[in-house]
């Protein structure tokens, strides 16, 4: 009798230990949307975006990247993914004296049979600019809802700094997910990452030609550092034109090294509007992904 009691206690203890180990192994969920390209331009450059400044979508890549916006900027991205998921992004920014303010959201809706129902990210950004130097910060809200309707939420911050030489070049540094405040259900796993980038206009931006290059290196928790190089080339005449782009390097979240190293894209220019397109053969979004977007900066 006593032996049976001891055996039952040992078995119960073992089961509790295994259950605790299983829960620890699962850990808090990592939002997939954080590794997705924030906008179509960055998608066409294999994720390089920290030094591609001047548009509303910078609220996700580099908060200080809003500084060149003189009045207003609006941006939107849409992708219908091969697994029937839908990814959308919207952002807006404007200037008040030496400050730029902006905000945006990323939303990923997965198929009905997925264990995860959706991912949502919302940011609010403030930037201070003096001369060619800008510093900015973003407050970021992230949530993941599973198929049972359980929502896990966290809050974090991004910071960034940019040094710009007129419209010729820009050197930018951004840190994503600095700190992690759990808001519900134990919070999310938000890996911190550092991004250092440089962009350079090889042609006068006021000429009819467009030729810009960028390079970016990123260091993220749990991943090897990656370096991406990108090139944009095109022509604009009387406000109308075409720009094509290509990016080469490891994509964000490519831990196994199975994603495409090269991405492609382009933009139709019509005054202050840019109609963007990007193609990624193999990415976290899926295989053969087409992304569409629009930017308007009057």
Could you say what each language-model-derived stretch is?
Residues 2-14:
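Bacterial N-terminal signal peptides that target proteins for export
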Residues 49-52, 78-82, 96-98, 105-111, ...:
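Transmembrane beta-strands of outer-membrane beta-barrel pores
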Residues 85-87, 101, 110-114, 135, ...:
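Outer-membrane beta-barrel proteins
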């Amino acid at each position: 009798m006593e032996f049976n009691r001891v055996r039952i206690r040992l078995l119960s203890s073992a089961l509790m230990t295994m259950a605790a180990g299983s829960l620890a192994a699962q850990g808090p969920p990592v939002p997939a949307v954080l590794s997705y390209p924030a906008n179509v331009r960055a998608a066409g450059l294999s994720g390089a975006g920290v030094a591609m400044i001047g548009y509303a979508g910078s609220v996700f890549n580099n908060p200080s990247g809003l500084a060149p916006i003189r009045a207003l900027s609006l941006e939107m991205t849409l992708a219908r993914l091969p697994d029937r998921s839908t990814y959308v992004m919207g952002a807006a920014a404007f200037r008040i004296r030496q400050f730029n303010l902006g905000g945006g959201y990323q939303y990923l809706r997965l198929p009905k049979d997925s264990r995860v129902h959706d991912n949502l990210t919302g940011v609010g950004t403030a930037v201070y600019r003096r001369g060619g130097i800008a510093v900015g910060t973003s407050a970021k809200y992230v949530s993941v809802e599973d198929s049972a309707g359980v929502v896990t939420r966290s809050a974090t911050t991004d910071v960034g700094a940019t040094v710009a030489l007129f419209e010729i070049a820009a050197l930018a540094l951004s840190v994503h997910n600095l700190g992690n405040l759990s808001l519900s259900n134990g919070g999310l796993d938000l890996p911190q990452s550092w991004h250092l980038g440089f962009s350079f206009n090889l042609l006068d931006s006021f000429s009819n030609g467009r030729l810009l290059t960028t390079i970016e290196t990123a260091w993220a928790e749990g991943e090897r550092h990656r370096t991406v190089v990108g090139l944009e080339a095109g022509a604009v005449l009387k406000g109308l034109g075409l720009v094509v782009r290509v990016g080469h390097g490891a994509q964000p979240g490519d831990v196994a090294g199975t994603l495409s190293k090269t991405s492609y894209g382009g933009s139709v220019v019509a005054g202050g509007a840019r109609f963007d397109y990007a193609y990624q053969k193999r990415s976290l979004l899926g295989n053969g992904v087409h992304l569409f977007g629009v930017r308007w900066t009057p």
